[in-house]
UniProtKB/Swiss-Prot annotation:
NCBIfam families, sorted: cmk
Cysteines joined through disulfide linkages: none
Protein name: Cytidylate kinase
BP GO annotations: pyrimidine nucleotide metabolic process
Family matches, as InterPro entries: Cytidylate_kin, Cytidylate_kinase_dom, P-loop_NTPase
Presence of the UniProt keyword Oxidoreductase in the record: no
Amino acid sequence: MTDLSPVLTIDGPSGAGKGTVSRIVAARLGWHYLDSGALYRAVGVAASWADLDVSDPAALVRCTFDTKVEFDDAGEAGLRVLVNGADATGELRLETTGALASAIAAIPEVRSALKERQRAFRRAPGLVADGRDMGTVIFPDAAYKVFLTASAEERAGRRHKQLMEKGVPVIFDDLLREIMARDARDAQRVVAPLRPAEDAVLIDTSGMGIEDVVQRVVGLLAGRTPS
């Protein structure tokens, strides 16, 4: 039986703030949270552990079906992710994992294999789904849709600050190039390209604090009745 619990989709490019905003909004609403990017990153980690060739789609599709991914939801603090029983949380956020996940996400069979896994997160009292095609492909019937964006420079700056605070040495220009390259891949892929849903509310988060964005998103829900 199909679960018709309400869904809020928050899509956008890498670094727009959707992950942090989605976790906080879900915690405040008391709803479940889906980090769809973590699923693709988890497959990327599994592929890396198995030393698979990223240019071998068949092997990556098999890896997708064989990989068991478990989430330990810590609310606003984020997620602990287990890949085939092993803690992969640290590796999930590496830039190399993100690049691998982006390449894997371009494979139609991988996206198809993960589609139902993502939809299974929809259950009462509601779901906040964070990703790149949540409002267009996974939950096109979602009652609430938001698309967060920001300039590539702004997003690179945020990531640079985040990594430096963690003691990870990184060059801003390298991050900017990686973000721009990923934007191009995500927008140009044949299957589920990155774009806002026609009925999504667009929010440019440039210059905005996280709490400002959270309040705006929560305010959108408060001001609307699910269709």
